[in-house]
Amino acid sequence: MSDVFNSPQARSKISAAFGIKPTAGQDVEELLIPKVWVPPEDPLASPSRLAKFLRENGYKILQPRSLPENEEYETDQILPDLAWMRQIEGPVLKPTLSLPIGDQEYFPKYYPTHRPSKEKPNAYPPDIALLKQMIYLFLQVPEATDNLKDEVTLLTQNIRDKAYGSGTYMGQATRLVAMKEVATGRNPNKDPLKLGYTFESIAQLLDITLPVGPPGEDDKPWVPLTRVPSRMLVLTGDVDGEFEVEDYLPKINLKSSSGLPYVGRTKGETIGEMIAISNQFLRELSALLKQGAGTKGSNKKKLLSMLSDYWYLSCGLLFPKAERYDKSTCCTKTRNKWSAQSSTHLMISMITWPVMSNSPNNVLNIEGCPSLYKFNPFRGGLNRIVEWIMAPDEPKALVYADNIYIVHSNTWYSIDLEKGEANCTRQHMQAAMYYILTRGWSDNGDPMFNQTWATFAMNIAPALVVDSSCLIMNLQIKTYGQGSGNAATFINNHLLSTLVLDQWNLMKQPSPDSEEFKSIEDKLGINFKIERSIDDIRGKLRQLVPLAQPGYLSGGVEPEQPSPTVELDLLGWSATYSKDLGIYVPVLDKERLFCSAAYPKGVENKSLKSKVGIEQAYKVVRYEALRLVGGWNYPLLNKACKNNASAARRHLEAKGFPLDEFLAEWSELSEFGEAFEGFNIKLTVTPESLAELNRPVPPKPPNVNRPVNTGGLKAVSNALKTGRYRNEAGLSGLVLLATARSRLQDAVKAMAEAEKLHKSKPDDPDADWFERSETLSDLLEKADIASKVAHSALVETSDALEAVQSTSVYTPKYPEVKNPQTASHPVVGLHLPAKRATGVQAALLGAGTSRPMGMEAPTRSKNAVKMAKRRQRQKESRQ
């Protein structure tokens, strides 16, 4: 295609079609194609200005806390459990680990990158080539309809009005203040336990809205939650011969930021350090619990002191989320992501991921369940939702994280929690952890967790990610609500939405646009807003059937006119109708689809960026994926994407690049890859491939630990209110005696051995007295072993069950800075003598800090000198 604006006739036709009237000296192309946008200068691009803005808006800035410098230690010394990994081929642990146990301390800093910027305005350029291709195709249609013109107009408007990028410091700060307002403003956050809820009553609501099953499979059960991370990797066999590695660690995005104290590095680059710090934290916690930590007095002080040493576990990096923003709000709206410290992320993921990844339970496969967790709109998923909407019974609701969907009086409501994460309290997360432990980590009534993990989940993890802190520039500031992006974000948000629906049920399900429904905000301290409402929803959906236009899924031809859609905003999806399949099928909401088409994200996978030819491969993936998620329904967008993808394919083939290898893992290159997870589909869009993608299949069978009440959430809400529901006073069916059944296997074996020994040596009055006393001694020894094992199992289980009911949250108090100039003082990089032996160092090495000047260095603390002397004595004793 030559440039569409080269021809005078084309320019005239474009002017007439789009109402463009260039004056003297103006060009049609300049008026239609937006120029490169240069963002304004960021007004808060310095720590002092950012601190002042936050303080003026009542935002809490914390006294800067320092970190010990990282020092190198041999991996085998720190992680002896994983020494075998250093002997196998392939990706293994590094020979050394860098741990925060140095003899100098520093104030950390983190300066996120914001693009586009005034200096780099074209960091993420719009897809002008796609726009020109669509204009060219538009000109080829003799009598183009308004629908086709709207496609070009919508793409042009998105290029003109929006930009893809990561915002500004001003946008981040404004978002922080808005989150604070949600948490503390007109409907301040409230502790659900003070509203009459209990952990168990909330769990029984979640039994309906988020049913879960145990981790692992029937033929491969998961290991109990009783180990440190390094022992979740189990070697079977011999590293010199045949071996297998059983991996019980959670799936983690290793390309994401590692957080403190490894700013600028990824989790994949610091995986050994992540495991080592997690190991030692849990071991120290376990040791303190055995000493009675968590109770009043000195033992509790020891626990708080340990948590103070590990303060960085609760301090996330505040980075800007790259999105497609309105240019007009570039300085006021930037979504923040709270990047959890890697060990924090790992430990919480060890609780949540094994359960949630193995619980494909939702509205599609469980009667009465309103959950959209793991819902996929393809393969008949969206058609099932439309059938649910069309059914006459109402009111009714669906829920996914901070999204609520209600059908009431034949009106569809899409409701979002307002800045959802800001509504969360530590007690909400405690309830979520209680649910995952008692419902997920349960084997026929036996808890699969110990006291250490229960204490971490219930009493420590909530303080690490809710109302904790974050780092931006050299400022350490408070986080209001939960940090967005932590390993429990989804569950916490889903719990908040569940409470909203519970109150709605207790109010006899009023209309969402009523004042009565709005009053739920004040009652719960949870803010929400109606994002979209569609009246006569059933009538509008029925109209899609006769109005469906010929296309890929209605006749197997390329579309000439778009089929109408109903924009449900169902996790971003709309509905249209396929005559060939006889069902409703998903297309991405039109605004979102054309916005995605306007601004490519580019190759986000850093490991792929360096590959030669990856940019052309990305174009193939991008254009075909746009068609798969709904572009196929819009004639100009579909054809333009098809042409541009073909051009990129030809380029790769001409250069001799192995196209199949590039596209084998195409979902890694697509922002929509998650929607196609688990689908074996070809990337080239054809009527056949689209039909295969949308043809209904039976839903996955559910995996639940306990039956779901088919009466739904309404029945459970009412039963809980009247006290008629099962086991309200109990602990979710986790019974101490049932636990003992599984925990006492060793005791049973010991008793069996004693009985076997007794039978093998009958009581013979003529037997030698020495032999008889030996037999008696063996019997007593076996019985003693059985007794001790039984007692230990009962005590450990009792401690675990007691911990999972605890409402305490343990966190040190970190002082606030009143003067913003003090908070933003450029102390970053300033090195100070270490004030203490950190918990990591003491646990790993049994020693405090070491100084280049020797043991008697004047800058050393008394504790450091004491620990160094102890280490020296230990060293001498080994020689």
UniProtKB/Swiss-Prot annotation:
Domain of life, per lineage: Viruses
GO molecular function: GTP binding; RNA-directed RNA polymerase activity
Residues bound to GTP: G259, L260, P261, Y262, V263, G264, R265, T266
Residue ranges constituting the RdRp catalytic domain according to the UniProt record: 398-598
Post-translational changes noted in the entry: May exist in multiple phosphorylated forms.
Keywords: Covalent protein-RNA linkage, GTP-binding, Nucleotide-binding, Nucleotidyltransferase, Phosphoprotein, RNA-directed RNA polymerase, Transferase, Viral RNA replication, Virion
Record's subcellular location: Virion
Keyword rRNA-binding included in the entry's annotation: no
Quaternary data: Interacts with VP3 in the cytoplasm.
Described function: RNA-dependent RNA polymerase which is found both free and covalently attached to the genomic RNA. May also contain guanylyl and methyl transferase activities.
Name assigned to this protein: RNA-directed RNA polymerase
Lineage, highest ranks first: Viruses, Riboviria, Orthornavirae, Birnaviridae, Avibirnavirus
